[in-house]
Curated annotation (Swiss-Prot):
ATP binds at K11, F59, R87, T93, R104, N114. It is an enzyme of class 2 (transferase). It comes from Bradyrhizobium sp. (strain ORS 278). Belongs to the NDK family. This is Nucleoside diphosphate kinase. Disulfide bonds: none annotated. Its cofactor is Mg(2+). GO terms for biological process: CTP biosynthetic process; GTP biosynthetic process; UTP biosynthetic process. It is found in: Cytoplasm. It catalyses: a 2'-deoxyribonucleoside 5'-diphosphate + ATP = a 2'-deoxyribonucleoside 5'-triphosphate + ADP; a ribonucleoside 5'-diphosphate + ATP = a ribonucleoside 5'-triphosphate + ADP. Its EC number is 2.7.4.6. The active site is at H117 (pros-phosphohistidine intermediate). The keyword Transport does not apply.
Length: 140
């Protein structure tokens, strides 16, 4: 399997409970390296751009409001098969359906407040990473 990069967001429901370290420990335990990380407060424009694919969905406004409600931690993760590996570590979007040992099973409050985001494909990972990081901020 090839070394690849993926994008992660630790969402406001997790940062408000000071879970960044616990989530990072699960990421690293899975064999992924955190090669870039910063804590930010996402602007409305950033959130609307990031989630533009959901603009026509009824939950779009609530999602944007949630993502700007508090700090988030944006990250670039690197490793063999990083995209699928991180999606496995995150667990199902619905925490009640997430497997034991996953981030969402351990920390998510609900489907809406599910603690983390991860890219779903190499193309989206590249776009998402570029939205939040300059090349010199990613140090592998």
């Amino acid at each position: 399997m090839a070394i690849e990069r993926t994008f992660s967001i630790i969402k406001p429901d997790a940062t408000e409970r000071n879970l960044t370290g616990a989530i990072n420990a699960l990421i690293e335990k899975a064999g992924l390296r955190i090669v870039a990380q910063k804590r930010i407060r996402m602007t409305r424009d950033q959130a609307e751009t990031f989630y533009a694919v959901h603009k026509a969905r009824p939950f779009f406004g609530e999602l944007v409001d949630f993502m700007i409600s508090g700090p988030v931690v944006v990250q670039v993760l690197e490793g063999e098969g990083a995209i699928l590996k991180y999606r496995d570590v995150m667990g199902a979007t619905d925490p009640s359906k997430a497997a034991e040992g996953t981030i969402r099973k351990a920390h998510a409050k609900s489907i809406g407040e599910n603690s983390v985001h991860g890219s779903d494909a190499p193309e989206t990972a590249a776009i998402e990473i570029a939205q939040f990081f300059a090349g010199n901020e990613i140090v592998g």
